[in-house]
Amino acid sequence: MKNQKTVVVGMSGGVDSSVSALLMKEQGYNVIGLFMKNWEEKDENGVCSSAQDYDDVRRVCDHINIPYYAVNFVENYRKQVFTQFIADFQKGWTPNPDILCNREIKFKVFLEKALELGADFLATGHYCQNLILDKGSPSLVKGIDHNKDQTYFLYTLNQQILQQVLFPVGGLEKSQVRDIARKHQLVTAEKKDSTGICFIGERDFRSFLSQYVAIQPGAFQTLQGKNVGKHMGTAYYTLGQRKGLGIGGAGEAWFVVGKDHERGIVFVEQGANHPALYCDELIATDLSWVAEAPLLPYTCQSKVRYRQNDQFCTIHRIENGKAFVTFDRPQRAVTPGQSIVFYVGNICLGGGVIQQPGPTYYDQKKSLPHQSPRND
């Protein structure tokens, strides 16, 4: 076909990217499958399934009759994602490597590789939409299946990138994607979705982290200064955490409500809705906008963690690359290192990395509004 466009599909060995490749071929594109390896199996002690994943890619590509290749970005990933991930933990943050991977690997060096192969577009199996709306430029829009929507992880995509990428399953429900895979007898039709962080696999997170972040025991302490147990290091705990604290006694469950990384203290209190877990403002840095930054002050919706219900907020000002944000309702466990992502309805505007939550309701001696919702 003389004017046939070429699409490189980023294939992970899962059902979403498999169906993405199929749909691109059905739509008349010249399709190339490209598998990306980001982590060395020798580091995984045999746990990582990358060999099986690539075998599934090969079988799918053979089945739908498209060529496929593998690329090795292990060194890129280690330098640009994993090193930052560990550095953030070492300073007491709780980072999100998926966001960094999308920015530095999938939609940077992987996209560059696709273009090298002669692609007009890169397609991935993400649940989001790339739509031309009223302004005539691409918009990053939530996937039809809001339960699977992945725009939270993709807020760093900009106009230039959006002009080069396609999201074939973004307009489908997950159940429809599996139905298509079954109908076309793809080997990945019933394959379980991957969860967690790729370089950790099924292993215990703490045991993995301990290989890279020193165990520095300290005290679990209440906000009144009472020691109630010992922890293995502030890096191993995150705000709002309940499981794995090992604090006994009567009464309600214990939760992490704060950390003093310099002094090696993890602050804990009892009760899922303790006021020390809530704040209604934050400062975000490392800002990224899909189009242009909004005129301020700007009221919109946001998420401070994946799958959170959208929360109304106002971006008041941006100074020295930092956004000062307040919320209409108290937010639970706003965590440094995670991202706040901004929306207008289903349109993703951009976001930034949470640097500092505001003072808690406990700090301000404020009561939580009646029936404050668990919004996580």
From Swiss-Prot:
Main enzyme class: transferase
GO molecular function: ATP binding; tRNA binding; tRNA-uridine 2-sulfurtransferase activity
GO biological process, one term: tRNA wobble position uridine thiolation
Binding positions (ATP): 10-17, 36, 125
E.C. code: 2.8.1.13
Residue numbers annotated as active site: 101, 198
Main location (coarse class): cytoplasm
InterPro entries: MnmA-like, MnmA-like_C, MnmA-like_central, MnmA-like_central_sf, Rossmann-like_a/b/a_fold
Source species, domain of life: Bacteria
Protein name per UniProt: tRNA-specific 2-thiouridylase MnmA
